[in-house]
Curated annotation (Swiss-Prot):
Listed transmembrane segments: none
Pfam family name, one: Lactamase_B_3
Keyword Hydrolase on entry: yes
InterPro entries assigned: Metallo-B-lactamas (IPR001279), RibonucZ/Hydroxyglut_hydro (IPR036866), UPF0173 (IPR022877), UPF0173_UPF0282_UlaG_hydrolase (IPR050114)
Family the UniProt entry places it in: Belongs to the UPF0173 family.
NCBIfam families: PRK00685.1
Source organism, top-level taxon: Archaea
Protein name from the UniProt record: UPF0173 metal-dependent hydrolase Mbar_A3716
4Fe-4S keyword on record: no
Keywords from the UniProt entry: Hydrolase
PANTHER family cross-referenced by the UniProt entry: UPF0173 METAL-DEPENDENT HYDROLASE MJ1163, UPF0173 METAL-DEPENDENT HYDROLASE MJ1163-RELATED
Amino acid sequence: MVGVKITWLGHSAFLLEAEKKLLIDPFISGNPLAPCSPEELNPDIITVTHGHRDHLGDTIEIGKRTRCRIITIHEVANYIKSKGVFAEGMGKGGTVNVEGIKLTMTDALHSSSIDASGFSFDGGSPAGFIIQINGHSIYHAGDTGVFGDMKLIGELYEPELVLLPIGDKFTMGIKEATKAVELILPRTVIPMHYSTFDVIKQDPEEFKRAVEAKVDTKVIIMKPGESIDL
């Protein structure tokens, strides 16, 4: 099994590197935790979980420069295309094979409006992604609260690694994220979407203690710019 390098870019942004490079929710400009500039990123694929600016981020600018493939919910894809960049829309429950990487769109409990130029556009429905790459299954939950079908996601796709928000207020907090881990039962979980701004400040060590007191799942607390290998 060939490895996958995973780098946290702060907030909910991750770069997955194998034969191809997959960039998730590239909120770089305006992200105080970002360890790089948008110009340093040259992905083959971008996935966007929903339309909020801290997830859509620099997708359009990076897409224009690199001509990478962009995969997102249908309505966000239409918005990106309106800016002169091609994007591919898909729906929840569907799977696409992109450059040898299988992407399955899952549900998420959140919202997805796109605020730009003083207007709010319909961003459809928020989502998460199951990413099957080089024999590994990874679940990026997007912005979400905990929901019962996370157990079904765990049973169907058996993700060995889960990327979960813990920031509270706009997503689930530590208590709810711990329950999500109990439902999914992955081998490893990485917390995300916390402490980017004061309003979502959380202690990831508290999350680590809560999870490891409940289940046999390893919690890896990453620093922005840090990488791990699967």
